[in-house]
Design a protein with these regions (language model features):
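Generic hydrophobic alpha-helical scaffold/packing signal
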Residues: 30, 34, 125-128, 154, ...
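Inter-helical turn/loop segments and adjacent helix faces that build the functional surface
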Residues: 8-24
Length: 249
């Protein structure tokens, strides 16, 4: 990133004279560096390759190239598909850098200035609560579900989150009376009551696990589509559909 900035700032090799085009390029470079910071975390770009990858990125001037909407979609869908392979029951993975960077980008656009200046703390909340999901899986002897998937996560003010304990937003009538539910839906969870109705069903037989899995997968897929659109809007990326031949850079 530093190499790209210097190459564009001093394009003639004279480090005493700033390139005449720098004023036109610096805004683009600043935006690209932020985009690649997010993109490289989601794709785990620097997880392998070492020094050779550093030289390759610098030589190709990688960070001066705009990431297309299609490349973003492929990267996000690949990350989502990998996370949906998890089979969690008792042990649920904690959020990692990929989940945090996606959530942070999304909530840039939904948190107000007052939210950001507030001393209130925020939790990463499982929309389908961990303990409740564990019980549903155990009741029908299931092999596990991706409870920690990004599509099941949101930020929630600490006080609001902990008051509902192991229930979802819609199950505790007392909890609903003490919060602004529409505010939670529009600002934090991006859900509607219909999205979580399947959690109120009984799953008691072994064959019920496939029904539970289907409902949960449908919920995650639907909500992840919402998250992608929110992230694109927040970062100013044009949403583009992709086909199977699209590759991640």
């Amino acid at each position: 990133m530093i190499s790209t900035t210097f190459k564009e700032m001093y394009s003639n090799g004279d480090y005493n004279t700033v390139s005449p085009q720098w004023n036109d390029k610096k805004e683009m470079i600043a935006k690209n560096l932020m985009m690649y910071y997010v993109y490289d975390i989601i794709t785990n770009y620097w997880s392998e390759g070492g020094t050779n990858k550093i030289h390759s990125a610098a030589k190709l001037n990688r960070y001066a190239t705009l990431i297309s909407g299609r490349e973003w979609i492929v990267a996000l869908d690949s990350f989502f598909e990998r996370s949906m392979l998890r089979a969690e029951t008792k042990k649920v993975a904690s959020p990692k850098s990929e989940e945090y960077v996606i959530l942070n980008c999304i909530y840039l656009n939904t948190f107000t200035a007052m939210d950001q200046l507030s001393i209130e703390r925020f939790d990463v909340e499982h929309i389908e609560p961990k303990e409740q999901m564990r019980k549903l899986i155990e009741n029908c002897s299931g092999e596990g579900l991706p409870i920690s998937c990004i599509a099941n996560l949101c930020y929630l003010p600490e006080g609001i989150n902990r008051s509902k304990q192991d229930r979802n937003f819609y199950q505790d009538k007392k909890y609903i009376k003490n919060i602004d539910l529409s505010d939670v839906e529009n600002k934090y969870s991006f859900t509607e009551v219909e999205d979580l109705e399947w959690m109120d069903m009984l799953y008691e037989k072994k064959e019920d696990f496939e029904v539970l899995k289907e409902y949960y997968t449908e919920f995650c897929t639907k909500r992840f589509t919402k998250l992608k659109h929110l992230l694109f809007n927040s970062l100013g990326i044009k949403y583009e559909e992709v086909d199977d031949s699209q590759e991640v850079i």
